[in-house]
Design a protein with these regions (language model features):
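Flexible, low-complexity segments enriched for small/polar residues
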Residues: 141, 145, 149-178, 189-422
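Active-site substrate-binding loop specific to GH73 endo-beta-N-acetylglucosaminidase modules
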Residues: 1-241, 419-422
């Protein structure tokens, strides 16, 4: 998929006219982004993720335009797999199998990837070997461990990790304790078990934590509500085995075992269809830069404090209003009632299990404390909890139990404490 997104699919070696002038050259998009976004970043880093400066006091670029041009040659000759050796430009989309090398379209000359790789890649090794050497060079680059480690910490724990935190995790990237480099399971374990991720004292500092990105906030709500479908199956993209949309004319439709075949009645809350309401949807990033930039700075006090707030880049005035409105609609639609009683769910409708919550409905303090723990990690202020309890007390005595639960839930979900991960 990334080859498709970054125009590397069917990327062909350069062609020349009779005088030797280039007629076409390899597309450089993927070569640039695989370095900038997916491995080493733009500038050299210290092992703790801080900038490594040159003798002139300026940041040191990790690569240059020549590096991009040379690396683009590595990625030539790859296309969708086909048994036809001449199908480089015509093979149909195939998202289930690896790309295939078509040697006639690969640049088999030498490639000088300096400063990423000190020794040029020799000529006539074939596309697979060229690719292996180039990826190994990026994987072994001293920037990769701190660059990837910091990004993972930002996504999983806090937007502004300390250099010491980044260093500890990067060392686990370099060696998982068994001599293996790049063991992401060990890296994630190091991130989540680090002192800075577990310490209540660290969590209390103003700079610690992160805004929950909307799609994870929503999926966390679904988990917290123990949502499931009666069929055990969930609505997703409806595709055939070759990745094409299902239509009445589709010649090779997938079987029910290969795809979520949903009937007409299913949940309106689909994680691939909520971007207009919450600024995110599963698999719908508008660019390869993700929904937001990892170094986004919000002008004002946070910028003055030197803090980055990546997820706030998609939290503008519009979405600051639409997200709570979406949550209100979500709570009402996902917890439907008929005269105060739960409505039977269709086989593919996500339905929460509120058995525990309904046992607490006559104890507003216990209900609020429960939602505080599940959705705000116990961080709701005493004032916020008191206000939610007051709102529940103010409901008419005739209010159905499920509606009381919905009220407490919505008021909790729309608090700042429920939106921030600490």
């Amino acid at each position: 998929m990334m080859a498709e997104y970054l125009s590397s699919l069917r990327n062909a070696k350069a062609t020349f006219d009779a005088s030797g002038a280039a007629l076409t050259t390899p597309d450089e998009n993927y070569a640039r982004e695989v370095m900038q976004l997916f491995s080493i970043g733009l500038v050299r880093l210290q092992p703790d993720g801080t900038l490594l400066l040159g003798d002139d006091g300026l940041p040191i670029p990790t690569y240059n335009q020549t590096t991009i041009t040379e690396l683009a040659k590595v990625f030539t000759g790859w296309a969708y797999p086909s048994s036809n050796a001449n199908a480089f430009r015509t093979a149909g989309a195939n998202y289930y199998n690896a790309l295939q090398l078509f040697p006639a379209f690969h640049d088999d000359g030498p490639k000088n990837l300096a400063p990423v790789l000190a020794t040029p890649i020799p000529a006539s090794q074939g596309g697979a070997k060229d690719l292996q050497l180039a990826l190994d060079a990026l994987f072994q680059h001293p920037n990769t461990a701190p660059f990837i480690s910091k990004l993972l910490i930002q996504r999983l724990v806090t937007s502004n990790p300390s250099p010491a935190y980044v260093y500890r995790v990067a060392q686990r990237f370099i060696d998982d304790g068994a001599g293996v480099r790049g063991n992401l399971g060990a890296v994630v374990r190091a991130i989540l078990t680090d002192h800075e991720a577990r310490s209540a004292e660290v969590a209390a500092t103003p700079s610690f934590g992160k805004l929950k990105e909307p799609i994870l906030r929503l999926s966390g709500i679904l988990r917290g509500l123990k949502a499931s479908t009666s069929s055990g199956r969930y609505v997703g993209f409806r595709v055939t085995v070759d990745g094409q949309p299902i239509t009445s004319a589709t010649p090779r439709p997938a079987t029910a075992a290969q795809i979520n075949m949903a009937p007409s009645a299913y949940s309106g809350t689909r994680l691939d269809g909520v971007q207009g309401s919450i600024a995110q949807a599963a698999l719908r990033s508008p660019t390869v830069f993700n929904f937001y930039h990892s170094d986004y700075v919000l002008p004002g006090p946070l910028a003055a404090a030197g803090l980055v707030v990546p997820e706030f880049e998609i939290t503008d005035d519009n979405f600051a209003i639409s997200v709570p409105n979406f949550l209100r609609t979500f709570v009402n639609a996902t917890l439907p009632t008929t005269n105060g009683a739960p409505t039977p769910a269709a086989p593919y409708t996500l339905t929460p299990d509120l058995t525990q919550e309904l046992t607490l409905v006559n104890d507003s303090a216990a209900l609020v404390a429960h939602f505080n723990l599940v959705f705000a990690a116990g961080s709701l202020s005493a004032d916020a909890q008191a206000r939610i309890r007051s709102a529940l007390t103010a409901l008419p005595a005739s209010t159905a139990a499920l509606d009381r639960v919905r009220t407490a839930l919505l008021l909790t979900l729309t608090t700042p404490a429920a939106a921030i991960q600490k």
